[in-house]
């Protein structure tokens, strides 16, 4: 069971000036033993436990930008100061002048125990840019410099982990809504898709019941695995929402979803959450 609040990604985001509901989106591709996933809508804090479950013993915060923590001159606080405000112990690794001006590289990296990541992403604030990558617990300053060099020289569409033998998962979040991740773990893409289904259903139930949050079960792994086996790209939209039942229409797409792509006229499948029995099922759409 997971808790889904009324301030989650599906609740606070919308599409267009008409503020249409934000769709579930999921795409996955595999190459050379790496899985690359783009998905939405999810806040980093809504996925953090999945990241922790497959990560090395430590995590490097590569980039962190937010308007939630500002100094007296209304400038964003440095990530290390944000971690201190949240009571998260970490090691600060300055990158130096060589990294200045390199797209995606900050002035410093934060390294912390992976189990502290949920405390950092505790839901009380929102990063509009966030990049994380796992590292060994005994990572050296030289290795962190090498990591930063790889991050700064890898193209957006190039595989990253193939150049980083010690890392298992890389996460990048934009607007605390859009998710891009790369992993060596073949089970993580299905876990992300299962979480998205739960987040969409849970946000609808929280709004319906006017409760601060709802508790919903996650689908068993066979449901997202069945979807991924059928097609790599999916879009989802809420259907029926009652206190007993939530349905989500799912349609396969020819390409990854982009903002502006509407849900097709006809769904291919329907995911149904039986709230009272705590079960999920997938059926052909009627």
Descriptions of predicted regions:
Residues 1-286:
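Structured alpha/beta or helical-core interaction and ligand-binding surfaces enriched in interleaved
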